[in-house]
């Protein structure tokens, strides 16, 4: 038995050691390796095939890509992108320098961006202007998504805007400033000796009103309050701030930054003097804001020396943003290394985000009403029906005025001031069936979404009634109905939607209730041409013949 086993082992050893066996073993290993590598490559190929890239727009030039589209002087960029989406689909890509841009013009795809992929799209791209004028790393609007941004957003929303106490305070401050603006409008009307009405640049009047509202709620400036102690100095600083802010908007609208397309070429913007000009404007705005902060600190010191309660330094509804932020500094600390600098940034963002957009929207509203007198008539009848004869419309009446609300919705649908919303991806993701690599810039064409014929019947027509008697009755402006997102959506949605709408509703209701208005143009029509720009602004001034409305008879 033992010898039999030994013979078998010797036989196996001879077979194993033979050259033919070695060749067979090598062949088998090679075959297995080839099959394994083929399987790996097949899996990778299949996976890559599943990563479908969005359609690429043709016509890109070497080096600059589709930059020529941004430079067109005969049509608005958002309209150009809208035409391209008709050709390439609601999701496509173009190239700006070496940067890939994903253009989205469909509400369902936008919903996917700001729900499923909201974290991926939670950052805004940095530009030369945000870097040197808006201090993007410390900004609530432009700072990277993370702990700092969340803390700043929480302070803005909970301490400055949304809490019941602050909401009531803001309402009172805005109402007082709107009242002041209508006093000035009445003064203009009183200069009319012909009885035919006074010609007023209403776009300028609306812009002044919105600036004064923001000035009132941020640093407590009262327009027309010239008799108050220190009012002269404060008024001069306010005028300086307004002038510098206007200059900033001009730079943003007219000065092209090469480094926004090619970041490595910032030296060209320095040689052109653009960086210097932006720094000067940013420093000037911060310097003036510093004066307002010091004024508030001085008042607090005076309150302490008079043994007054620090919390009552600005009585109840008179507390402005600086008051609240200084109180937060007393109790804890603002995020960041320089609390004063943070306050300056928040002041600037309040003006940058609140003055131009609201005044531009109301300018569009009034233009549409003048071109649609039947809508204006119906809005006035609604106010007369819900507001007692002889009484002035109040903020508390606004919830009853559904047609006024529909007018504002329809205007913001047709003419969203922020016609394009921009983000960029921090990680690879998918939109629809398309793969989006990390670092891709996202451009949401809000203007195109608002005019989608598959969503909106007669999308180019001004029809406020669509929000009162169709499937759009429940559609609002708060960023949850993605077919109507003039304030944006997702984590970066505008935090001041409620306050902004309240301001526009009340100002518009006062204007409709109190004044007869018609276009000052010879044909009686308002020119609705839009500026050639990234945003949606009216091209020509809005001149209106306006006169106080006769009291209605019972």
Curated annotation (Swiss-Prot):
Gene3D superfamilies: Cytochrome P450. The lineage of its organism: Eukaryota, Viridiplantae, Streptophyta, Embryophyta, Tracheophyta. Heme binds at residue 494. Highly expressed in capsules. Expressed is stems. The chain crosses the membrane at residues 23-43. Its cofactor is heme. This is (S)-1-hydroxy-N-methylcanadine 13-hydroxylase CYP82X2. Pathway: Alkaloid biosynthesis. It comes from Papaver somniferum (Opium poppy).
């Amino acid at each position: 038995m033992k010898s039999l086993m030994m013979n078998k082992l010797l036989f196996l050893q001879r077979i194993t050691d033979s050259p033919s066996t070695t060749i067979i073993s090598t062949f088998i290993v090679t075959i297995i390796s080839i099959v394994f590598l083929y399987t790996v490559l097949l899996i990778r190929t299949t996976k890559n095939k599943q990563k479908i890239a969005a359609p690429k727009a043709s016509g890109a030039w070497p080096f600059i890509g589709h930059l020529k589209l941004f430079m067109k002087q005969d049509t608005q960029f958002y309209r150009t992108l809208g035409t391209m989406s008709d050709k390439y689909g609601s999701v496509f890509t173009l190239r700006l320098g070496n940067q890939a841009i994903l253009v989205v013009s469909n509400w369902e795809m936008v919903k996917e961006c700001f729900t499923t992929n909201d974290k991926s799209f939670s950052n805004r791209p940095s530009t030369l202007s945000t870097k040197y004028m808006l201090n993007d790393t410390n900004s609530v609007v432009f700072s990277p998504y993370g702990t700092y941004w969340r803390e700043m957003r929480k302070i803005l929303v909970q301490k400055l805007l949304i809490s019941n106490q602050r909401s009531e305070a803001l309402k009172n401050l805005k109402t007082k400033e709107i009242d002041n603006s209508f006093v000035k409008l009445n003064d203009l009307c009183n200069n009319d000796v012909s009885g035919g009405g006074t010609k007023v640049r209403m776009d300028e009047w609306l812009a002044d009103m919105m600036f004064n509202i923001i000035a009132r709620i941020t640093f407590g400036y009262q327009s027309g309050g010239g008799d108050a102690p220190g009012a002269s100095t404060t008024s001069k600083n306010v005028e300086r701030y307004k002038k510098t802010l206007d200059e900033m908007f001009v730079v943003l609208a007219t000065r092209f930054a090469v480094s926004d397309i090619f970041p490595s070429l910032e030296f060209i913007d320095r040689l052109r003097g653009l960086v210097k000009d932006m720094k000067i404007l940013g420093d000037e705005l911060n310097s003036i804001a510093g004066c307002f902060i010091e004024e508030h600190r001085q008042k607090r010191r005076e309150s302490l020396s008079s043994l007054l309660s620090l919390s009552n330094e600005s009585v109840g509804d008179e507390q402005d943003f600086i008051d609240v932020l200084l109180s937060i500094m007393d109790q804890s600390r603002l995020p960041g290394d320089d609390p004063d600098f943070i306050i300056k940034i928040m002041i600037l963002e309040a003006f940058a985000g609140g003055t131009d957009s609201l005044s531009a929207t109301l300018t569009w509203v009034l233009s549409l009403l003048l071109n649609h007198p039947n809508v204006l008539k119906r809005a006035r009848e609604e106010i007369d029906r819900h507001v007692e004869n002889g009484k002035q419309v109040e903020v508390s009446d606004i919830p009853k005025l559904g047609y006024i609300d529909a007018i504002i919705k329809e205007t913001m649908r047709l003419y969203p001031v922020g016609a394009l919303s921009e983000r960029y991806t921090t990680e690879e993701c998918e939109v629809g069936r398309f793969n989006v690599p990390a670092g891709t810039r996202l451009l949401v064409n809000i203007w195109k979404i608002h005019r989608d014929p598959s969503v909106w019947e007669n999308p180019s027509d001004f029809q406020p009634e669509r929000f009162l008697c169709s499937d759009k009755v429940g559609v609002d402006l708060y960023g949850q109905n993605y077919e109507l997102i003039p304030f944006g959506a997702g984590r970066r949605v505008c935090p001041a939607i409620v306050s902004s709408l309240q301001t526009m509703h009340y100002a518009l209701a006062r204007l409709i209730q109190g004044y007869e208005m018609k276009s000052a143009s010879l044909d009686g029509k308002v020119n609705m041409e839009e500026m050639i720009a990234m945003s949606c602004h009216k091209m020509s001034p809005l001149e209106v013949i306006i006169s106080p409305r006769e009291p209605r008879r019972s």
